[in-house]
Amino acid sequence: MKTFVLGGGCFWCLDAVYQKTKGVTAVVSGYTGGHDPYPDYYSVCSGTTGHAEVVAVTFDEEIIPAEVILDMFFALHDPTTLNRQGYDVGTQYRSSMFYETTEEKILFEEAIDRNQALWSHPIVTEVSRLPRFHVAEEFHQDYYAKHPEQGYCQVIINPKLAKARKYYSAWLNA
């Protein structure tokens, strides 16, 4: 099993898609990349902690290649906008990838290079060593599955799921 810690806007969005991805055994929403030793949702949203909203995606490489997990990541958010994803604005929504090993760092950098051709502006995704992963509050775990009718889910997450179905249907569970 391998785990990638990825930030691409609101963690609910990435969580919703990766929860439906073949070979993914766990998705945990959380915070990382900042200086606050005890972040919570409200402090992270204040923009004062330096943390990003992220997901820790654990997957089985025997079922899904790491490159597919990373290419999905770049397809599911706009990695060319600094500190923003759509209406979600602030450093907590930055495009980010946090590595624990040199191998992961190389995979992340290769994914950026591979996906740059798909974008007309430079990718600004931050690639940093994972300092510590802080699990988000239970309310944020598997949010879409618990609240599919909520407005944010309908307007923001559903289009991302549709995009995943269009481009990655072979990798999604029915």
Curated annotation (Swiss-Prot):
Signal peptide coordinates: none
GO MF entry, a single one: peptide-methionine (S)-S-oxide reductase activity
The UniProt record lists the keyword Iron: no
Catalytic residues (positions): C10
GO biological process: protein modification process
Catalytic class of the enzyme: oxidoreductase
SUPFAM superfamilies given in the database record: Peptide methionine sulfoxide reductase (SSF55068)
InterPro entries reported for this sequence: Met_Sox_Rdtase_MsrA_dom, Met_Sox_Rdtase_MsrA_sf
Domain of life from the UniProt record: Bacteria
Keywords for this protein: Oxidoreductase
Record's catalysed reaction(s): L-methionyl-[protein] + [thioredoxin]-disulfide + H2O = L-methionyl-(S)-S-oxide-[protein] + [thioredoxin]-dithiol; [thioredoxin]-disulfide + L-methionine + H2O = L-methionine (S)-S-oxide + [thioredoxin]-dithiol
Role played: Has an important function as a repair enzyme for proteins that have been inactivated by oxidation. Catalyzes the reversible oxidation-reduction of methionine sulfoxide in proteins to methionine.
Family under the similarity heading: Belongs to the MsrA Met sulfoxide reductase family.
Name of the protein described by the UniProt record: Peptide methionine sulfoxide reductase MsrA
Lineage, opening ranks: Bacteria, Bacillati, Actinomycetota, Actinomycetes, Micrococcales
